[in-house]
UniProtKB/Swiss-Prot annotation:
Pfam families: IreB (PF06135). NCBIfam families: PRK05473.1 (NF003997). Belongs to the UPF0297 family. Disulfide bonds: none annotated. PANTHER family: UPF0297 PROTEIN YRZL (PTHR40067:SF1). It comes from the Bacteria. This is UPF0297 protein Amet_2459. InterPro entries: IreB.
Amino acid sequence: MTEKINLTMKFSLDKEKEEQARDIILTVFQALQEKGYNPTNQFVGYILSGDPTYITNHNDARSLIRKIERDELLEELLKSYLTNQ
């Protein structure tokens, strides 16, 4: 039983989900900018709370963001950040 506690779990998205997440992030980012919101603040609010009202309905962004889980969204954002450093 204690052996399981010491193991590290692995989380990973398949390529198709990665591409879908990336496309959704870019679309939502653009919609937030078009409506005059700070996309960074709105994404953080959504990721931390799970409340979709942080995301605008403009260009169907709110329904798009709900197509991916928040952990998948966070993984894609973090991966992009770390890759571009």
